Amino acid sequence: MTQAAFDQASDNGPMTPSGSSFGLFAPAVVLLALISALATFLILMGLTPVVPTHQVVISVLLVNAAAVLILSAMVGREIWRIAKARARGRAAARLHIRIVGLFAVVSVVPAILVAVVASLTLDRGLDRWFSMRTQEIVASSVSVAQTYVREHALNIRGDILAMSADLTRLKSVYEGDRSRFNQILTAQAALRNLPGAMLIRRDLSVVERANVNIGREFIVPANLAIGDATPDQPVIYLPNDADYVAAVVPLKDYDDLYLYVARLIDPRVIGYLKTTQETLADYRSLEERRFGVQVAFALMYAVITLIVLLSAVWLGLNFSKWLVAPIRRLMSAADHVAEGNLDVRVPIYRAEGDLASLAETFNKMTHELRSQREAILTARDQIDSRRRFTEAVLSGVGAGVIGLDSQERITILNRSAERLLGLSEVEALHRHLAEVVPETAGLLEEAEHARQRSVQGNITLTRDGRERVFAVRVTTEQSPEAEHGWVVTLDDITELISAQRTSAWADVARRIAHEIKNPLTPIQLSAERLKRKFGRHVTQDREIFDQCTDTIIRQVGDIGRMVDEFSSFARMPKPVVDSQDMSEIIRQTVFLMRVGHPEVVFDSEVPPAMPARFDRRLVSQALTNILKNAAEAIEAVPPDVRGQGRIRVSANRVGEDLVIDIIDNGTGLPQESRNRLLEPYVTTREKGTGLGLAIVGKIMEEHGGGIELNDAPEGRGAWIRLTLKAEGPKAEPTDASTKATGAATPAAPAASAMARDAAADSAARGKNERT
C-alpha cells in the first residue's frame, strides 16, 4: 500500500456514536435493567419487605429475562456494526473488542463475586437443615429403634431353641399326662418371660397353649412362614404394626408339632419407631426439593450477572468509539509495519494532543527500524554462513565436543559427545557439566584458575558397567568480556591404552618365557634320569627318594605350564575351528574340576547338545581358567563365613549365540577398575600372574565372542558370562537337561586319569590365583 492510499484509508472521519439513532432509549433501558437487577438481588437477600416466595421469584425472573433480551439485542446491534466496520478494513474494530472485553472483565468480577456470595449464603442456610450431622441424627434414631427390635428377635431365638430342647425331652410326658405337660409348658414360658407359648400344627391349629395370665391372648398369624423353620433355625416373625415379636420351630421327635412363642415389646418403642420413620420420610422429601430451590436461585443470579455484563459491554462499545478515531491510524500503520512495510508514515494532527506526539514518535521509530533492518540482514547472512560451517565441522569430527557458557552449563553437544557419554542432547542441554559428568569437575576448576588458555588430563568414566578412559581438554573461549565460556573435547583412548599395555606385556611375557624355559628341560631330564638309574639301587628311604624326584618332576611341569601361559599370551595361536559339541566340553571340564576340588559343589545345567564351531583346546583352556579362578576364590573366603562353596555352570542358546554362565560364591570381583582385569598382569591376588582372564578374553575374541564380568545375582561371588557364535538354526533358550549336584558324571578312563593328576597337582601347588 502506498502512502497516499494509507492516508486515504485512515482519514475516513470519526465513527458516530450510536446514541444519535437511539436517543435516550438505549441509556434508559440500560439504567432500568441495572435497577431491576439490583432490586432482584435485594429481594433474594431478604433486604426488602417483599418475601421471596415462589410467585415473586418467577415474576422477577421474567422481568429480568426480558431485560436480558433487550440488552442482548442492543449489544448485538453494536457488535454487528463493529463487524461491518472490520469487514471494511477498519482497525478500530479490534480496539472496540478489547475495550469491551476490559469493561466486561471489570464488571463481571464483582457480579460473579456477588453471585458466589449469594449462592454460598443460600447453601449455608440449606446446609444447616441438611447437614451430615442432622442426617446422621435422624437416621440414627431409626437405627436405634430397629436395633432394639432386632435385639428382641435375637433373644427370642435363643429362648425358643432352649425351650424346644427341653420339650423334646418331655415327649413321654406329652403322650402320657397332657395336664402335667401343660403345667411344664406354662412354667417354661413364665421362666423365659414368654407371655405367648403354644404348640401348633402345620395348618396353624393350636394343640397346647401355656396358661400365662397377662390379660391378652396371642393369635397365630396367618402369614407365618412355618414351613421355613428347621429344628436348628427357627423362623422369627416381626409384624409391622404389632407390639410383639414371635418365633416358631419344629419339635424333634414330635409328629407335625411346632413350638410357637411370642414376647411383648414396649409399645413406646414401637411408637418412637413409627415417629422416627415418618420424620425420616419427611426429611428426605424436603431434601429432594432442595435442588429445585437451588436451581431457581442459580438462574436468578445468572440473569443478574448477565444484565450487569451486557450493560458494561454496551457502555464499553459506546465509550470506545470516542477513543478509536486517532488510534485507528496508528493501528493501521502498525499492521503495515508488521507486514514489513517500513516506509509507511502516520499523518500528524496537532489537535489530537498527546496522540499527535505518539504519531510523530511512531514515524521516527519506522525510520530507525528501516535502517536497523538493513544492518541486521547483513549480519544475519554472515552469522548463518559461519553457523553452517561450524555445525558441519562438529558433526564430522570423531572427538566429543561440548560447549559451556560462563556458568559451566552445556550449550552445545555434538553427536560424538552424545555417543561417548551415553546422553541425548535433550537430557544434557542447559545442565552443569559437573552434574552430567562429575569426573570433569577437577579439570573445570583447574581451567577456571589456570593462566594458560587450555588444560588437559585423563578421566575414567563408568557407563553401563564399562570403564572408559578419556583424554579431556578444556579450552577457554577468547572474549573481551569478563564472563566467557569453555570448549571441552573428549577422546576415547581406552582401546589405545589397552593395546599399549597388551603390547608391552606381551614383549615382557616373551622374554620371561625364554629365560625360564631354558633350564627347565635339563632339570626335568636330570630328575627322571636319577629316578630311572639310581632308583633300583636305593634301598634305604626309597619312598622319600621317589617322592622327592616326583616332586621335582611335578614342580618342573607346573613351572612349564606357567611358562606356557606366558608363551600362550605372548604368541596366542590362531584357533583351529571345527564342529564341536559345547555341552560335552562343559561336562568334561566340570568333571575335572569337581575331582580336583572335592570340597566345592559344582552344579551344571547344560542341554544335551550345543553344536558350535570352535577350537576345542582353547575353549577348554578358557573354561578351565574360569572354573579354577572360581574355586580358588571360594578357598580365599575366610572359613568362618565361607559356608558351602558352590559353583554353578549353565549354558543355553540365545538367538545366534551360545551363552555360558559361571556363578560362584567366592570373594567376588572388585567394583573399581573391573574391566582392567581383562588386561595382562592385572590381578587382585598376591600370587596371581594376571594372565588367566587375559587369555580367556583373547580366546573369546578370537572366536568372535566376548566375556562379561558381573557380580553374582544373589549374595557374594562373581558371575562370568562367555559368549560365542552357535552353529545351526536359531533357537530360543532351552532348559537344562543335565543337572548334577556334587556327584561325578561318567567319563572316559583317560579323563579320570587326567582328573587325578589335576587333583594331585592342585594339592601340591596350593596356588591362590584370582584374576
Curated annotation (Swiss-Prot):
SUPFAM superfamilies: ATPase domain of HSP90 chaperone/DNA topoisomerase II/histidine kinase, HAMP domain-like, Homodimeric domain of signal transducing histidine kinase, PYP-like sensor domain (PAS domain)
CDD domains for this protein: HAMP (cd06225), HisKA (cd00082), PAS (cd00130)
Keyword Coiled coil: no
Membrane topology of this protein: Multi-pass membrane protein
Listed name of the protein: Nitrogen regulation protein NtrY
Native organism: Azorhizobium caulinodans (strain ATCC 43989 / DSM 5975 / JCM 20966 / LMG 6465 / NBRC 14845 / NCIMB 13405 / ORS 571)
Gene: ntrY
Residue ranges crossing the lipid bilayer per the database entry: 22-46, 56-76, 99-122, 295-319
Alphabetically ordered keywords of this record: ATP-binding, Cell membrane, Kinase, Membrane, Nitrogen fixation, Nucleotide-binding, Phosphoprotein, Transferase, Transmembrane, Transmembrane helix, Two-component regulatory system
A cellular-component GO term for this protein: plasma membrane
PTM annotation (Phosphohistidine): residues: H514
Subcellular location: Cell membrane
